[in-house]
């Protein structure tokens, strides 16, 4: 046998041995995550805004699993809070006074003043701001959670938080609240003549 063939076979056997060893170690020393934290995190809106007092949704989910209150997520609103309370088996509470706002606000960039520095784009946790370097930026209001993280880094102070005015596009129609009654059809008797 040639030296080259022996080297290839030896390296293949060595790679196979270490592959099996790593596979065994991965199964033997597997670290399980907390499934409750994963479920809580799936319920949270994933805005990573920090309005709850934690640096993101995962740390807040871990805090809830450790006994923290479920009413600290403003972007999620009452619906998210009720789902969290149901999962944790606690009574739903009103949203935290600091978290509760009567009118939803979104970021608004005064485009004529924007210098295109991209600092607001980098600060936005939900990618609701579009634009490019040295060009005007704008906010996708449908995606904006109102977390206010884009206002601080703006060097020219051209970002305002404005209330969302309700119109036909964003009105909460609550179609599931309309009462629906099922009417049973009764067979008609044939007319006799």
UniProtKB/Swiss-Prot annotation:
Coarse class of the protein's main subcellular location: membrane
Hydrophobic: region residues: 1-26
EC number: 7.-.-.-
Subcellular location: Cell inner membrane
Annotated GO biological process: electron transport chain
Annotated signal peptide: none
Positions bound to [4Fe-4S] cluster 1: 49, 52, 57, 73
The 4Fe-4S domain, residue ranges: 32-90
Keyword Zinc attached: no
Cofactor: [4Fe-4S] cluster
Family (UniProt): Belongs to the 4Fe4S bacterial-type ferredoxin family. RnfB subfamily.
Primary role: Part of a membrane-bound complex that couples electron transfer with translocation of ions across the membrane.
The name this protein goes by in its record: Ion-translocating oxidoreductase complex subunit B
Organism from which the protein derives: Shewanella oneidensis (strain ATCC 700550 / JCM 31522 / CIP 106686 / LMG 19005 / NCIMB 14063 / MR-1)
